[in-house]
C-alpha cells in the first residue's frame, strides 16, 4: 500500500462526497504512448484506484492507502482499522462473487467493505450487498474528472 501524497490528484472541495477530480490535460497521442505505454486518453485502472482513495479522503478518512497492484488479496484501497475496498475499471458489470471476496476480507479484519465499479453492478450483486454489508459506488471518468456516486444506502451513509 502506498500513501497518496504527491500523486497530483486533487479533490473537488465544493462537493467532496460527490466528485473526485484528477487534473487532466490530454497530451499528444504519441507522447501518451511513450510515457504510459498506451494509446488511449482513458485513465488506467491505477487512476481509478487513486480516484476512489481521493473520494474517501474527501469524506474525511485519513491515511487512505492505495494497493501496489501486486498480491494485495483483492484490496485496492484501505484505511487501516476502518475499511477495505476494491475498485474495478472493467467494462462489464460487477457480479456477486467480487463483493463476497471483499466482504470476506473485511470480516476477517473486522472493518467495513466498500466497492467501486466503472460499469455498475448486476441486480443480484446489489441485492447481495445489503446482506453482505458492502457499500457500493460507481466511478466514472468524464472529460477531465472522475465522478463517484453511492449506489446503495450503505455507500451513502459511509462516514469516517
Language model features by range: what are they?
Residues 1-160:
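Mixed-charge (Asp/Glu-Lys/Arg
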Amino acid at each position: 500500500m502506498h500513501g497518496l501524497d504527491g500523486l497530483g490528484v486533487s479533490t473537488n472541495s465544493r462537493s467532496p462526497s460527490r466528485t473526485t477530480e484528477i487534473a487532466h490535460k490530454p497530451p499528444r497521442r504519441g507522447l501518451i504512448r511513450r510515457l504510459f505505454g498506451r494509446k488511449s486518453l482513458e485513465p488506467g485502472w491505477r487512476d481509478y484506484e487513486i480516484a476512489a482513495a481521493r473520494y474517501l479522503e474527501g469524506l474525511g478518512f485519513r491515511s487512505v492507502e492505495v494497493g501496489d497492484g501486486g498480491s494485495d488479496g483483492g484490496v485496492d484501497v484501505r484505511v487501516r482499522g476502518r475499511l477495505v475496498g476494491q475498485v474495478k475499471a472493467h467494462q462489464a458489470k460487477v457480479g456477486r462473487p467480487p463483493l463476497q471476496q471483499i466482504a470476506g476480507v473485511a470480516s476477517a479484519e473486522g472493518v467495513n467493505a466498500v466497492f467501486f465499479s466503472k460499469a455498475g453492478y448486476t441486480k443480484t450483486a446489489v441485492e447481495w450487498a445489503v446482506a453482505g454489508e458492502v457499500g457500493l459506488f460507481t466511478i466514472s471518468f468524464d472529460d477531465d474528472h472522475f465522478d463517484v456516486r453511492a449506489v446503495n444506502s450503505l455507500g451513502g451513509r459511509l462516514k469516517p
